[in-house]
Amino acid sequence: MKWWEKEPLRIIEIFDCFDLKRLSPEEIARAVKKLGGNSQHFHCMQHSTKIYGSGLDDRSLYFNTSAGSVQNPDRLTEYIPYAKKYKIKIIVYFNVHWFTIDFGKRHPDWVQIKQDGQPMDNVYGTGTSFCINSPYREWVFQILKDLCKYEINGIFYDGPIFFSNTCYCNTCQKLFRDKTGENLPQKSDRNHPLWKNFIEFQAESMEKFLEESNNIIKGINPELLFYMNGNSNWPYWPTGRDNHRIIKHTDILGAEGGFIYGDLNQTPIFKPAIAGKLLSSQANNKPTVIFDCADHKPWSWYVLPEAEISLLLCETCFSGSNYWFAVCPDDINQPEMKAISRFGNFIKKYPDAFYKTESLSNVALVWPTKSAESYTGSSVPRTDFTSIIEGEEIGNLHMEFDGFYEALSRIYIPFDVIDENNFDFLDRYKLIVLPNTACLSLNDCEKIKKFVFSGGNIVGSFETSLYDEAGKIREDFGLSDVMGIQFNGNIFGKMEYDYVSPVKNIKSRYLKDIKKILFPAPDYGISVKTTTGNTEIFFCKRMKGRYDGIPEVSNDPMMVVNKYGKGTSIYLAGSFGKTIANFRFIEYFTILKNICDWLSSQYVFVEDNKNVEIFLRKKGDSIFLYLINMTNGLKRPIKFLQTLYNVKLKLKETKPVRLFALKSETYLKHKKTRDGIEFVVPELNNFEIIKILTGGEK
């Protein structure tokens, strides 16, 4: 077992790469320890100087290497004794995506070229980037060889990356021409017949670069950790970073799920957990890490409130991932840092709750990776590597996914996030949620059909399965027989003041507690007719204005229930998740809760509508119930969490159990009920973890 697999990783980065003299080596080691870290990203390469400019430069390497054009003091050798003294694992941070303009001018054949023929010159507004297909790769490999001579524990690549308008360097053009016999297409022209070839070429280039990097490192020292900054729930076409390829040649799968930007009210509070859950499903049983940042991006020297930092940590670790936290030198002693140190030391005290646990969820929400690459409703979010690229408003993938994610969380459903690569293992779940999973291959559809026919259940919305994996529209849904519908040929909307209406006088388990005869429609709908399915909610006829008389029920189905073999399909003929994300209509939450109540089995029940998010995982005979307090102010950034008292929970557990609250360090009393047990958490501040002991473990 490798060192990074033996305990939860608590990775701290002291962000001193802009001034390596800011802190002494021992001050850095003490800071990492103070913040609860057991490992760190260590900087021995300076990223900005007044002389050389912004970005990495071959004159700014502070360790012994033949790749440097200047011999600087050996900071790495100086630091190693302090890392040993404070028992910290050293992971060298290696920036492989941002370089000084001057460095690029000295190596013009290394520079990434934009589709307009100009060199890349605005990385973070100030620097350039080099191409991994160019001779630059040999410079990187030499640095790896030199770093591996030191007593370090790992190497982290920040990058590598392509950009949404690169790369057209001579090397890339030659390699693509040799491979296809064609010239590189415009990357911005997603309808070009060679566009997908270009995207796959870049993803393959990334994979080959990582494979060779890993071979160099492991060939020198098999005990060295190697990983990079990967992808989360966004497309890989702009960057070439395909997680399924990345994890083949790295030891950990990581992504910037905890970098939060701009107006935080527009950012899902669940962002780190989305990344953590998704990466866990993509990592092939290897560890995952979510990169969390203490600053409020893009203000990199402005720290977030303590409550926001606490939520980043909880969302990251309760999803089953390790954390990495970046802290600026000036912020080490700020009061907000107590959240990091307390959490890190809590993990150190109770590692089992954070180490090699397994999800107990029987509900899975699909992140549609094929749609993210090929569907017109797919957008690119703002990250440290990408600018916002808007998809079409109709069928917006991110909002559809985020809406379902939020709803499942708000109704207390523990769930996983998976992608199409997990469809071989659907039998571990009872309910699969497909949020506008538009682009599916025939093979994907067959796996879903088999799952439902054998007794599994699905919820699908809008254009789910209407396109093949390449984004080409089908004549009918690939899952038409499962969903009991046929495509009528058109999409309607935008509906800004229109309605849907439940069918009257039917006793439907899925409409329980829906009292209104009208409630708002999704902003876009799709025209279908039922075959074997039964309509339980109809769209109303479109109105010319919001006061255009009393809404009349149409013949267009909005919710169709269909039995298929032993399983059930619920089809929602509109942008259901997007409407939740935008408006949070109570009826939408109620419908989804009813579906989960009947088509999945739940172990945990939260009483009294407390604003709590739950995660459920197991290890051996122990079950861990993670509670996050979501009771806060109406706007972000969140400055405080309102303490909850007497949070009442029920467990569908018939075995004798003991309940131990890790954070409050107390055993909880419980009483038996007809179908399980119930107990009370007396006080919930930011979080609590309940260890449910069902065996002889203490």
Where are each of the predicted segments found?
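Aromatic-lined carbohydrate-binding/catalytic grooves of carbohydrate-active enzymes
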Residues: 33-78, 98-124, 164-176, 237-246, ...
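Carbohydrate-binding surfaces of carbohydrate-active enzymes
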Residues: 6-8, 195, 200-232, 236-237, ...
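An active-site-proximal structural segment forming one wall of the substrate-binding cleft
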Residues: 128-163, 216, 346-349, 353
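Short, acidic/polar
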Residues: 18-34, 134-147, 236-245, 305-313, ...
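Mature N-terminal, pre-catalytic/accessory segment of carbohydrate-active enzymes
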Residues: 1-58, 62-93, 215-219, 359, ...
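Catalytic domains of carbohydrate-active enzymes, especially glycoside hydrolases
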Residues: 24-51, 150, 252-253, 313-319, ...
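Active-site-adjacent "subsite" loops/lids of carbohydrate-active enzymes
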Residues: 92, 96-150, 172, 176, ...
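A cross-domain feature marking catalytic cores of carbohydrate-active enzymes
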Residues: 13-16, 44-46, 90-96, 159, ...
